[in-house]
Structures are given as C-alpha cells and as structure tokens.
Amino acid sequence: MKIKYYGTRGSIPTPGADTVKYGGNTSCISINTERDLIILDAGSGLRLLGLDLMENGHMKGDGHCSFFFSHVHWDHIQGIPFFLPAYIKGNSFDFYGSPNVHTSLEDVLAHQQHFLNFPVEFGDMPATFNFSGLKDGDTVKIGTAEITGKKLQHPGGVFAYRVEEKGKSIVYATDTEHYSVMDWRLVELAKGADILIYDCNFTPEEYESKKRIGWGHSTYEEGIKVVKEAGVKEFHMFHHDPLHSDDFLEKELLEPAKKLFPNSHLAREGWEFEL
C-alpha cells in the first residue's frame, strides 16, 4: 500500500506561515493498493488529490475509486465540490459511510451543494456516484484490500476504518473521544496494525483544563494507550487543531509523545510512504 496525506488539519482549513510544515488542509488520505485507489475522507485536501490524479493521467473519463467517510461534519466533506475528477463524465466513485441518524450521505452532500451554497449542485456533477451504507463491524472488499468499519464516539457518530492488504494494515481513527475509559472497540480494530492514525486535536492539558470533554476529540496520551494495548507498530497524530502552529505541534505534542512511544509522528500534509 502507498499512503499519502493530503489533509491533516481539523475543523477548518488553516493556511498561513505557521502551518506550512504540517499543513492547513482538512482531512483527506489516499491509499493506493495493488489495483485500487481508496480515499479516506474528503476534506479540503481532496482538491489537491484531484489535481494530482488529473496530472498523472487518471480520472479522464474512465477513472474509479472508493471513498470511505468517517462522518459528515463539514471538514470531512468540504472537498467534494472542488474535486475536479467529479466533473468528468465517465468517472465513477463508490461512497461508503455510516448512515447519519437524520439523513443519508447522499442527502448531506446534496445539501452542501445546494444552489444557495455553491454554483454547481451535487446532482449536476457529471461523474457517477454509488452510495453504500455501512453497519458497525462491516467489512468491504476492494480488490486485494479489505476495509472494516467500527463505530466510535463523536457527536453525531463516527466510523474508524482498518485497511488491510497482504498482511499490512493501517487504522484511521479521527474525530473520536476516549472519555474516562479505554475504547476497547478501537483496541480490537487496531490489534497488531502497522500504523494507527489517531485524533490528537488537543493536548492533555487542553482537554482537561479548558473543559473540552464531550467535544468529540482526543489526545496523544490516549492514542498511545491504544497503541500499546493493541500492539500497534507506529503512531501518527492527526486532526491538528487550527490554533496549533507547527512549532506548537512539535513542542507540545511530538516531543512528549516520543517519550511515551518513540515511534510517534505528526501527520504531515504531502507525506507519502509505503507499507
């Protein structure tokens, strides 16, 4: 598998001199398996992914890939209107996600591109979109890869995903909150994984002292507890708070995280690696 971060920021795109190193685009990760392209979330980083696909000669009328949405908060879907391959007839996309308690994924995306919000409505985009709802614990086979979804804790609900191919595995658990106990569902999902990508929106001090309990986000300390319990090899801190500069991330998250688990890293926009 070849993995690339196109968006690592949480909540809102955060451009500027203070976020150049780790990136300002919101959640979007590409995973190229042996035969297929899998995309985790569709934040503002999706625009850059679309440009890369076009430059590489893909998605010009016969392209296909599969999207897996953690949830439908805006920072995880806002890249769809700016995804250039969606404007090319003949391209097709499979969208997977947990049905929202109030509406479907398709309705959420259509509402985002209502004519009062955006000049092109979702239903007018020329590409073909296929929607599939997932239940807790479902596994989807995409070519040589298997993707398993597990429901975690976040306002409105959220899915974590384990992507596995040929004995290698990566777990994506953004926008999840630990509350006062270990989330054993995530431990089970992450068991023996090569990499855990985990929501580290807050420092432990921010989480406790600024009364952010219940906001649906977590800390590096809690993520490392999962890593150790599940026997994960590598830990990636993700969903960076918009208020956290590059310097802050390195000093207040990376340095203390490495003391607890040396193979800890900050997810960085543009970082590409292979499993």
Predicted feature descriptions by range:
Residues 40, 70, 174, 198-200, ...:
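Active-site flanking residues adjacent to catalytic metal/cofactor-binding acidic residues
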Residues 178-269:
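Cap/insert and terminal regions of metallo-dependent hydrolase folds
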